[in-house]
Swiss-Prot record:
Gene3D superfamilies the UniProt entry points to: EF-hand
Originating organism: Bos taurus (Bovine)
Annotated site location: Interaction with PxVP motif in substrates of the catalytic subunit: 118, 122
Location in the cell: Mitochondrion
Domain of life from the UniProt record: Eukaryota
UniProt record, GO biological process: calcineurin-mediated signaling
Gene encoding the protein: PPP3R2
Protein name per UniProt: Calcineurin subunit B type 2
Length: 170
């Protein structure tokens, strides 16, 4: 793995040189086995993520090559989504990708159920959660295709102004 300068500027556009150095230092501290990639265990050692029920989904979204680990490039790309300098569209796409598990551009009933199940655990019975999912799909699905597109998701999130609260965790 090279130094910070070995990464194209476009992947680091939300971070200045000092921030990249700080992120590199943090990455190396998390990389306990010095493998140049963070395993699930190493990734979840971040205090910000230890209690997050969606940590596996965050890892899956960060892990763009699908190898089950997060290398420094993926770490920079992923954390840049939380930068206060990141744009609204990127933040919305990141949030959408947490739900779009199969990466087909839509949130299906099953995907919404799985992600909400991660969040609520056993606090709701499955039938109660399914009712919530069904109602959510009906409410958000403006074109009636039975799934939530990025546009439908974005419209709701923008109306709630949730995206303004997606700020840096690094």
């Amino acid at each position: 793995m090279g130094n910070e300068a070995s990464y194209p500027a476009e992947i680091c556009s939300h971070f200045d040189e000092d921030e990249i150095k700080r992120l590199r230092k943090r990455f190396k501290k998390l990389d306990l086995d010095s493998s140049s990639a963070l395993s699930v265990k190493e990734f979840t050692s971040m205090p910000e993520l230890q209690e997050n029920p969606l940590v596996q989904r965050v890892i899956d979204v960060f892990d763009t090559d699908g190898d089950g680990q997060v290398d420094f490039r993926e770490f920079i790309l992923g954390t840049s989504q939380f930068s206060v300098r990141g744009d609204e569209e990127q933040k919305l796409r990141f949030a959408f990708s947490i739900y779009d598990m199969d990466k087909d551009g839509y949130i299906s009933n099953g995907e919404l159920f799985q992600v909400l199940k991660m969040m609520v655990g056993d606090n709701l019975k499955d039938w109660q959660l399914q009712q919530l999912v069904d109602k959510t799909i009906i409410l958000l699905d403006k074109d009636g295709d039975g799934k939530i597109s990025f546009q439908e998701f974005s419209a709701v999130v923008r109306s709630l102004e949730i995206h303004k609260h997606l700020v840096t965790i690094v």
